[in-house]
Amino acid sequence: MGQKINPLGFRLGTTQSHHSLWFAQPKKYSEGLEEDKKIRDCIKKYVQKNIRISSGMEGIARIEIQKRIDLIQIIIYMGFPKLLIEDKPRRVEELQMNVQKELNCVNRKLNIAITRISNPYGDPNILAEFIAGQLKNRVSFRKAMKKAIELTEQANTKGIQVQIAGRIDGKEIARVEWIREGRVPLQTIEAKIDYCSYTVRTIYGVLGIKIWIFVDEE
């Protein structure tokens, strides 16, 4: 059987960079890791609660965390930041307060910045959310996959592969369905590939969505 390695970890240091940048003593490392998870969960929960879109998408591509001795810098890359910022300018401050309360950090300053990504549908996380929304609304999985591929074609990507696994369309036996458009060279380390795995809960059970997007060759 072919061994499947995570395409992001496989390319760390060449085409992929870390989403968390900080140093810690070996004994304190696990605390820092837990802190990162708390920050990410807190932000996602806040965005879910405050953004109401018809498709139920959060639109978060990734959250980068940089830590120094006296400062935690958080950059949220979003596909549709207007939905969070335009309603109330106070929202970012409120989010900052929430994260600070969650972390209970007294002697460190917290700074949150929101950056818009140029092609939202060229990002696998946002696409996976889109497909999840479609599947929850009982759209047929093939239709959802094809629509996702159409959206990425507008974002000038070189190739995409979408895979859905589980009880598709409520069938008794779980199966894996996939579709590929263009090139997706998973073995080439120089190829910049974005990847995301996403779990969606439907009325029939849990489905797994995996998306590989071939962005560019370095």
UniProtKB/Swiss-Prot annotation:
Q: Which GO terms describe its biological process?
A: translation
Q: Read off the Gene3D superfamilies from this record.
A: 3.30.300.20, Ribosomal protein S3, C-terminal domain
Q: Which GO terms describe its cellular component?
A: chloroplast; cytosolic small ribosomal subunit
**Known InterPro entries for this protein?**
KH_dom-like_a/b, KH_dom_type_2, KH_sf_prok-type, Ribosomal_S3_C_sf, Ribosomal_uS3_bac-typ, Ribosomal_uS3_C, Ribosomal_uS3_CS
Q: Which GO terms describe its molecular function?
A: rRNA binding; structural constituent of ribosome
Compartments, as annotated in UniProt: Plastid, Chloroplast
Tell me which stretches of the chain form a coiled coil.
Answer: none
Specify the signal sequence span.
none
Which keywords accompany this UniProt record? Answer: Chloroplast, Plastid, Ribonucleoprotein, Ribosomal protein, RNA-binding, rRNA-binding
KH type-2 domain location is 47-118
Quaternary organization: Part of the 30S ribosomal subunit.
Which PANTHER family does this chain map to?
Answer: 30S/40S RIBOSOMAL PROTEIN S3, SMALL RIBOSOMAL SUBUNIT PROTEIN US3C
Report the family membership: Belongs to the universal ribosomal protein uS3 family.
Name the UniProt record assigns to this protein:
Small ribosomal subunit protein uS3c
- What organism does the record attribute this protein to? Lepidium virginicum (Virginia pepperweed)
- Mind giving the lineage of the organism this protein is from? Eukaryota, Viridiplantae, Streptophyta, Embryophyta, Tracheophyta
